[in-house]
Amino acid sequence: MSSPNIWSTGSSVYSTPVFSQKMTVWILLLLSLYPGFTSQKSDDDYEDYASNKTWVLTPKVPEGDVTVILNNLLEGYDNKLRPDIGVKPTLIHTDMYVNSIGPVNAINMEYTIDIFFAQTWYDRRLKFNSTIKVLRLNSNMVGKIWIPDTFFRNSKKADAHWITTPNRMLRIWNDGRVLYTLRLTIDAECQLQLHNFPMDEHSCPLEFSSYGYPREEIVYQWKRSSVEVGDTRSWRLYQFSFVGLRNTTEVVKTTSGDYVVMSVYFDLSRRMGYFTIQTYIPCTLIVVLSWVSFWINKDAVPARTSLGITTVLTMTTLSTIARKSLPKVSYVTAMDLFVSVCFIFVFSALVEYGTLHYFVSNRKPSKDKDKKKKNPLLRMFSFKAPTIDIRPRSATIQMNNATHLQERDEEYGYECLDGKDCASFFCCFEDCRTGAWRHGRIHIRIAKMDSYARIFFPTAFCLFNLVYWVSYLYL
């Protein structure tokens, strides 16, 4: 009896399928622990983009592909020729973002504006076939392709921003669409109409067009119906308030052709706070101050004269200061009218006292009184019949020594000018008070001129202010 073959039995055991599967698992497990056999891609083969905390992997475009595309596009490209030359006009879509406006210089009639200006057009010579949809380029490519010769027609001075690099951007799409944007600071002309100053409103334009291409070559269109503006709270308008804007398109005919002109109008309204404090209130107070002389005794010549001269000189100074913030226009502004009328009121108050002082100081004794003083009999038998004053005491107003002057009228009278007939012209003298020609006329008493002025001057000034403010603010 032969002994059992142990090795052959073991060999049959190890050759079973179960053993083979176990060995395969162990081998794969050992290989996975070795780092050299792990399959990983380099981080440089992908670019990561974060969007709402979701990571999207996109293949990175080799720089060599962009260089090849640009070289192919610029090969044989002539940047001196516009797209579709000789075929059809080039259509330029324009857009604008207003970063800030101000300040407005009324003396030079100009304003400063900071904008981002964008132009879009199609150039079939710049089409390319690639998986790249758009080429995002910097300002170095601007001079290598055709760019519209757009200029700002009412610009006095324009500066492009160059810090830290030129603020220009260029985009080229694979279908030939080109986007060109740049940042500009422009000092633009604005013809201010100052008839209603300082209650004026203005529409300051910003106009641009092609410099050399008429509308048969280039046509401009607005990309959007309205121009976008930034935060108006940071604008340095100072004396003005921003009301709104509007954009228009028009054709301007010149000797060199018809050009499409694009315009943006910025509506501005002037704030009156500064001028109310600096001009209107001081002028009004000076006019009121000139009326104080009507309550000062007419015999106080130095007081009334110095007050009148001081108010006149002050009004002259105020009118000069008010004009400094304006250009030297040939027409009368609303402020000029107000200051001039105030000056007339102040000057009239001074003239009123001069007139009063002249006639009061040049009174002559009446002829009847002279006869009475010379003839004792007439002085003896001349007496007045007793009279009773039936007027209420409240109706008797004694102002500025008027009652005292009435008592002295018996001793002093007024004579007409030499060589004049009192019955043939209107005069203010006492001797002219009687006569048929005086019937229905108003007799003015020199002694009561201050009383009349106390009523006339304030009433006239209030009526002027009513008409002035209603006309300029509501009409």
Curated annotation (Swiss-Prot):
Reactions the enzyme catalyzes:
chloride(in) = chloride(out)
**What InterPro entries does this protein map onto?**
GABAA/Glycine_rcpt, GABBAg2_rcpt, GABRG-1/4, Neur_chan_lig-bd, Neur_chan_lig-bd_sf, Neur_channel, Neuro-gated_channel_TM_sf, Neuro_actylchol_rec
Q: How does it sit in the membrane?
A: Multi-pass membrane protein
Keywords from the UniProt entry: Cell membrane, Cell projection, Chloride, Chloride channel, Cytoplasmic vesicle, Disease variant, Disulfide bond, Epilepsy, Glycoprotein, Ion channel, Ion transport, Lipoprotein, Membrane, Palmitate, Postsynaptic cell membrane, Signal, Synapse, Transmembrane, Transmembrane helix, Transport
Q: Where is this region: Interaction with GABARAP?
A: 433-450
Q: What would changing residue 323 to W do, according to UniProt? A: In DEE74; does not affect protein abundance; decreases cell surface expression; decreases current amplitude in response to GABA; increases zinc sensitivity; accelerates deactivation
The record's family statement is: Belongs to the ligand-gated ion channel (TC 1.A.9) family. Gamma-aminobutyric acid receptor (TC 1.A.9.5) subfamily. GABRG2 sub-subfamily.
- Activity regulation here? Allosterically activated by benzodiazepines. Activated by pentobarbital. Potentiated by etomidate, propofol, pregnanolone. Inhibited by the antagonist bicuculline. Inhibited by zinc ions. Potentiated by histamine.
User: Which intervals lie on the Cytoplasmic side per UniProt?
Assistant: 297-302, 360-451
Q: Which PANTHER family match?
A: NEUROTRANSMITTER GATED ION CHANNEL
Q: What does this protein do?
A: Gamma subunit of the heteropentameric ligand-gated chloride channel gated by gamma-aminobutyric acid (GABA), a major inhibitory neurotransmitter in the brain. GABA-gated chloride channels, also named GABA(A) receptors (GABAAR), consist of five subunits arranged around a central pore and contain GABA active binding site(s) located at the alpha and beta subunit interface(s). When activated by GABA, GABAARs selectively allow the flow of chloride anions across the cell membrane down their electrochemical gradient.
NCBIfam families membership: LIC
Q: Which residues are glycosylated?
A: 52, 129, 247
Upon changing residue 274 to C, the result is:
Found in a patient with generalized epilepsy with myoclonic atonic seizures, cognitive impairment and behavioral disorder; likely pathogenic
- How does the record describe the protein's post-translational processing? Palmitoylated by ZDHHC3/GODZ; required for the accumulation of GABA(A) receptors at the postsynaptic membrane of inhibitory GABAergic synapses.
- Membrane-crossing segments per the record: 276-296, 303-322, 335-359, 452-472
Name recorded for this polypeptide? Gamma-aminobutyric acid receptor subunit gamma-2
Q: Which residues lie on this side of the membrane: Extracellular?
A: 40-275, 323-334, 473-475
Per the UniProt entry, the effect of residue 82 to Q is: In ECA2 and FEB8; abolishes in vitro sensitivity to diazepam
